[in-house]
Amino acid sequence: MTQIKDAIKIFEASHPGCQAVFIFDQSSAHASLPPDALRAFEMNKSDGGKQRKQRDTVIPMSNPDPRFRGHPQKMTTVSGEAKGLKAVLEERGFNIKGLKAKCSLVCPFESQKCCLARLLSQQEDFVNQESILETLIKEAGHKCLFLPKFHCELNPIEMVSLHNYILTPSHVSTT
């Protein structure tokens, strides 16, 4: 994050009053979430216990039960403990009878409702979270874009390098 903070300072000093557009590839480092991010697979089935506290959220407008759409949802209990999967899903109006907390090893690829963690992890507020990088750039008043995943040889910087490689011989004097 130090590098991007420095890049923002340099840009703002060089171009006062302008807005930068920072473009990144799909590196896992660029997608790092903050410590209080919403992560269903790190939650217990029940409230409390050894699980980290997660940030409060707003129940998405895509929530299956329209009665709860747009409502704020605290991710801690009245006593300050982290809420479990069961409580969070019940507050959203999900019927979770018969579902286990998590699949034993890995959730089946085709399944969307195999366990509580999978069900919650597919909710819009859990899926669409801003990375630390994105938040930092937006808070500074700039734009942040992520390129779609592609093969490394199709990376735009590779295209520029190839273009320069092709053009260089025609512009270099051999005398």
Task: List PLM regions with ranges.
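Short functional hotspots at interaction and active-site rims
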Residues: M1-T175
